[in-house]
Amino acid sequence: MTIFEQMESEVRSYSRGWPVVFDRAVGSQMFTADGDRYLDFFAGAGALNYGHNNAGLKQKLVDYILRDGVTHSLDMFTEARRDFLQTFQDVILQPRGLDYRIMFPGPGGANAVEAAMKLARKVTGRTTIVHFTNSFHGMTEGALSVTGNALKRGGAGHPLHHAVAVPFDGYLGGEADTLAYFEKLLDDSGSGVDTPAGVIVETVQGEGGINVATPEWLRKLRDLTTRHGIVLIVDDVQMGCGRTGGFFSFEESGIVPDIVTLSKSIGGYGLPMALTLLKPELDQWKPGEHNGTFRGIAPAFLTGAEALRLYWADGELEASTLRKGERINEVFTEIAADAAPEMQLKVRGRGLARGIEFPSGELAGAVCRAAFERGMLMETSGAGGTVMKVLPALTITDDEVEEGLAIIRASVREVLGSTSEELAADEVPLPVVVGS
């Protein structure tokens, strides 16, 4: 038994599917203590959009530490905090015509979500938060209440209240108008659904299976929430910071949410940091009404600001992300077309959040396991883990993209058999389905 097995809780997940000991990482490559190399198409579940140990950020961080720059500051004023706020305003908000106050709720995405829901309830005086089928918003109890995943919800140990799930875009299939259903519930006094305080939505459901909301659906949702006086919260924890192309995942739709949550890659270097962006008229907090010990980690301010300057002062990263995403989509479409018809593989995604849906979680997991054996990291997502998901760093090179696609193609062929054969009768090992 290793020290990990001896000391760590049974709750650990990723290490079960990737049973190696990592030691170093650079860009989109990770290396084990034994020197084995792995191509990373996981990127810390979206926390490493700029890759591991990004050279443009690393030296700034090292220099800051060596000069004894402030590390922990709660919400005290610091030079690092000022620089981040000014850079975020100049590089992100002003060019997009967005007017948000910035709240630092704590170190992680669930902190940002909790703050958003608390504020929606505070300003409206209502209780319920509406979320969508297959949503994932975090592991704290409030965030779990608006999460669809039964395994995650079960970890709470008691019923989760004050939340209502409605169908996400495409959930009912075909041409079904899921927002018409939602609005019918709101308009019908006999539906049993009260007007909610807020609606929380992911424009692309990452953990839910790379389910993509169309721009038209998002615009209809924005219109619906405006007409009913409901606070619209966009959870951009995983899909923000350029994952879908634009800095915010909602940019393509043209909507302006009332509240936006950011975390994961907002710190630039993989350091913990979260933001809750809110329209000024919603900033009705009393001083200290929501706080947290680790809401002022200056090294994350430092690398977060530098990442904004390096990658968001022009449109180069966005264009590169969209181009690489289209290349992945092209190959995934070929893989789906090459598979036996009964497999009915479905390709999903936007930008560099891409996936292939398989008929079962066993198959999707087996593909991820085969890729790991070939030296590549990727995971499954969705109900039952049926979607093979890739979230490579936005800075991944074209050569690394092609290497990863070749591994995926070979892994799918290994698991499904040749393009003309039915799935082999051999038992496929059940994978561990993990989530961030």
Where do the language-model regions lie?
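Conserved N-terminal phosphate-binding loop of PLP-dependent enzymes in the Aspartate aminotransferase
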Residues: 1-436
